[in-house]
Design a protein with these regions (language model features):
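Iron-sulfur cluster-binding cysteine motifs and their immediate structural context
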Residues: 1-7, 17-33
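Switch II (G3) loop of P-loop NTPases
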Residues: 50-55, 64-89
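C-terminal lobe/tail of nucleotide-utilizing enzymes
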Residues: 119-201
């Protein structure tokens, strides 16, 4: 009696585990476009590398890894990871020397922060926290961070000017000199906490 193997492509993670597990060599690989990587150069000379998954692709991790191939070992590279603790976050955090967790002082924000911290502790990563929209919630998140000894790198207040400038596609640091100083100071704090790594990303 013939036996058939059905591969559910929509659920495929492209890990190759089924290929290795099938002792009859009944499964073969094929090329598939998972996404695209685009590279942009800013007037300042900095590069932006964007990885964009194709519609319907279950796991964006291969696209993230593809984008990472275009980073340079010299200088500093910033990885922008998605929220949550799913595979894309882990794939991004795993290659970073230091992680900046952005949260909000709300019960929901604290819950997500605890999950992220637990994940990063498992990965043995160094990290600090930036509190966005500070002043809107209670003190629970501050008390928890103090209890855990986790550094607060900066607090960004709830500011309508930030929302307005962002909605116009501009950077608040380019419009408001005060925020330029704010983010410059944040950068210095991150460098101080990250230490002198041989390859800072």
């Amino acid at each position: 009696q013939a036996k058939h193997i059905q591969v559910l492509e929509d659920l495929c993670h492209d890990c190759g585990a089924c290929l290795a597990a099938c002792k009859y060599n009944a499964i073969t690989e094929k090329e598939k476009t998972l996404g695209h990587v685009s590279i942009y150069r800013l007037p300042s000379g900095a590069l932006i590398v964007e990885g964009r998954s194709s519609i319907g692709v279950y796991s964006p991790v291969p696209v993230i890894k593809g984008a990472m191939h275009h980073t340079h070992p010299d200088g500093i590279t910033l990885f922008d990871a998605p929220p949550g603790i799913s595979c894309p976050f882990i794939a991004t955090a795993d290659k970073a020397d230091y992680i900046v967790l952005v949260t909000e002082p709300t019960p929901f924000g604290l819950n997500d922060l605890k999950l992220s911290v637990q994940t990063l502790d498992t990965l043995q990563k160094s990290y600090g926290v930036v509190i966005n929209r500070s002043g809107l919630g209670d003190n629970s998140i501050y008390e928890w961070l103090e209890e855990k000894g986790i550094p607060i790198l900066a607090e960004i207040p709830f500011d309508k000017e930030i929302a307005r400038v962002y909605s116009e596609g501009r950077l608040i640091a380019e419009v408001n000199p005060g925020y330029r100083y704010f983010f410059t100071n944040l950068y210095r704090k991150i460098r101080n906490h990250a230490g002198n790594c041989s390859s800072q990303r």
